[in-house]
Amino acid sequence: MTHPQQPAEPLYCPPCTPGQVERSATIDLDALEHNVRRLKELIGDRALIAVIKADAYGHGAYPVARSAIAAGADLLGVVHVNEALQLRADGIDAPLMAWLHTPSTDFEAALQEKIRLGVSGWDLEAVAAAAERTGERAIVHLKADTGLGRNG
């Protein structure tokens, strides 16, 4: 498998405050693949989700997604449906899940692209309506606040 020599350009890079040093991090895709394979060995037949939200934390969602899937990740996780739709447009056909939705989230497009959805109670009606309109089956992961004050 070949990998780009340069990390992908981040989606947004705020300018440095005068006097600050610009920071960067580089992902070694071979090391990432090694780590995913090792995790799969440790967890056996359990599913492994590789979270690549926010453009893989600015490292390039597409190359990180390809490497994670090639090494055995079962599912890719992103925050927003638009991130998942971009991965589909880029040719990633692996299972994808998005879990943070806004009133403008395009659930119809998500269902048509077979994107799994992490949903709370208030998302269920919108997802069910989108499934009815598209004729697509929605695969949902229910989110619950377990006391941390977070919904996930």
Locate each region found by the language model.
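N-terminal amphipathic/basic leader segments beginning at the initiator methionine
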Residues: 2-18
